[in-house]
């Protein structure tokens, strides 16, 4: 669909895909939160806030404050995700991989072989940039573009991954929802690019974000828009424009894994720093100038009245109130037993409260269970490299088929992306001299 200028102006005023684009951006931020090894909350502020707000609703205020003190980058979840992707990376080392290209002239085949290696950095680009984009930007878009000025005998098309947050609006192709009829996205220097099935245009915008002038226009004879979604696997039937990478379905489990990992750290503090308790001694704090004195950790004035602060709370004793916070390494004073009935209290006057072993074991086991569940769900049955339990031949076959199914899904996505890029580049560079191609990443 070739867009007219007035259509582009209307789209800029009222883009139809704004909500879908924002959903994709938010989902990718959650992926980054659990995938990338960040060192500061500023790198991924929004998903961090969402996670901590969720935890805040689960815990009492004092426990949440402790959780915040223990929450620190880098997080433990990227290590789990890294283990998952280390298993899935085998998709690049499959057997019997092959690719073939047909041209009307054999010399063009040699030219293409050199061009895709030297100019497109294939096949390495799929193992590096493509692999990373799959992990954190499955909603990114593959764009095949042309330089504004042709400097050689043949056109020199190139491709890149366009982040979804740079997109203004788009319309997908009716017969293939991964390809576009047209695409409009932001460019540097307050410009926009418009891709459709007849041309590639760049417009300059004014301060009001209105089209000011046409910067460049490159006509093409592709018959389709030279852009498509990088990843083909849809999130679900209702959200076909949102793409699902291998760990998308495990984002909630990753949240829980992070929660229990940090909760375990809290429990771990009680091992080297248990809570000590002993019979309380009367606090003898007294302010000689004002007459204020301590009564049970709070202040009374010279008249015996509690001292009320501006916020309505009773003022705490500056000497002993901090001793009453129960945390790792705290010292608590407990009331002296009442011996009015003449019964002697035989308890140890100084006691140590250690961590409850069952609570610690539960957190340790739950972390291990969640990690194993995440790995198996993404990688396939028998997700770990080593198996402690003996398994029979049928189980071995089932595990192999489970893993193979996962790798085949990855393989298909990369094959479709690579074929689109290479076919489009070949058509732009060689025109009708390019016949067809075949891309197979093997088994």
Residue positions per predicted region:
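Short, charge-rich amphipathic segments
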Residues: 3-23, 34-69, 288-312, 328-356, ...
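Short, compositionally biased low-complexity segments
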Residues: 87-91, 104, 218-239, 338-347
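C-terminal helix-loop subdomains that flank or include functional centers
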Residues: 369-386, 390, 400-443
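Extended, charged amphipathic alpha-helical segments
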Residues: 233-390
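Extended, helix-rich architectural segments
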Residues: 1-162
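Extended, regular secondary-structure scaffolds
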Residues: 109, 113-253
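Intrinsically disordered, low-complexity boundary segments flanking structured domains
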Residues: 75-79, 88, 121-133, 139, ...
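Non-transmembrane, amphipathic alpha-helical segments
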Residues: 355, 359-362, 366, 395, ...
């Amino acid at each position: 669909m070739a867009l007219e200028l007035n259509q582009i102006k209307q789209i800029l005023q009222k883009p139809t895909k704004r909500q879908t684009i924002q959903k994709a951006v938010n989902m990718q931020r959650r992926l980054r939160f659990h995938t990338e090894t960040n060192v500061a909350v500023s790198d991924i502020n929004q998903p961090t806030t969402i996670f901590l707000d969720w935890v805040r609703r689960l815990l009492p205020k004092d426990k949440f404050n402790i959780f915040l003190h223990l929450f620190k980058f880098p997080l433990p979840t990227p290590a789990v995700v890294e283990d998952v992707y280390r298993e899935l990376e085998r998709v690049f080392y499959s057997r019997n991989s092959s690719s073939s290209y047909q041209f009307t002239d054999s010399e063009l085949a040699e030219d293409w072989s050199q061009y895709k290696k030297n100019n497109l950095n294939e096949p390495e680009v799929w193992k590096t940039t493509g692999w990373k984009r799959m992990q954190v930007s499955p909603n990114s878009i593959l764009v095949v573009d042309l330089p504004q000025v042709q400097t050689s005998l043949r056109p020199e098309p190139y491709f890149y991954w366009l982040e979804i947050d740079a997109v203004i609006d788009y319309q997908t192709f009716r017969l293939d929802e991964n390809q576009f009829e047209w695409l409009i996205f932001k460019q540097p220097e307050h410009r926009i690019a418009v891709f459709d099935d007849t041309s590639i245009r760049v417009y300059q915008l004014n301060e009001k974000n209105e089209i000011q002038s046409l910067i460049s226009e490159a006509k093409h004879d592709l018959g389709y828009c030279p852009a498509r979604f990088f990843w083909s696997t849809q999130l679900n039937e209702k959200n076909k424009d949102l793409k699902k990478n291998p760990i998308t379905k495990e984002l909630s489990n990753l949240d829980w894994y992070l929660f229990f990992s940090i909760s375990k750290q809290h429990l771990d503090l009680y091992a080297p720093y248990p809570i000590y308790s002993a019979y309380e001694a009367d606090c003898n704090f007294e302010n000689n100038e004002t007459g204020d004195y301590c009564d049970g950790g709070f202040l009374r004035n010279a008249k015996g009245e509690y001292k009320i602060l501006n916020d309505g709370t009773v003022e705490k004793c500056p000497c002993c109130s901090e001793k009453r916070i129960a945390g790792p390494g705290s010292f608590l004073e407990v009331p002296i037993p009442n011996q009015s009935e003449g019964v002697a209290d035989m308890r140890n006057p100084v006691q140590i409260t250690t961590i409850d072993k069952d609570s610690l074991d539960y957190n340790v086991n739950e972390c291990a269970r969640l990690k194993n569940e995440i790995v198996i769900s993404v990688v396939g049955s028998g997700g770990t490299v080593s198996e402690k339990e003996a398994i029979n031949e049928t189980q071995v076959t089932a595990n192999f088929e489970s893993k193979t199914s996962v790798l085949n899904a990855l393989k298909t996505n990369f094959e479709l992306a690579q074929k689109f890029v290479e076919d489009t580049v070949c058509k732009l560079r060689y025109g009708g001299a390019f016949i067809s191609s075949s891309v197979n990443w093997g088994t």
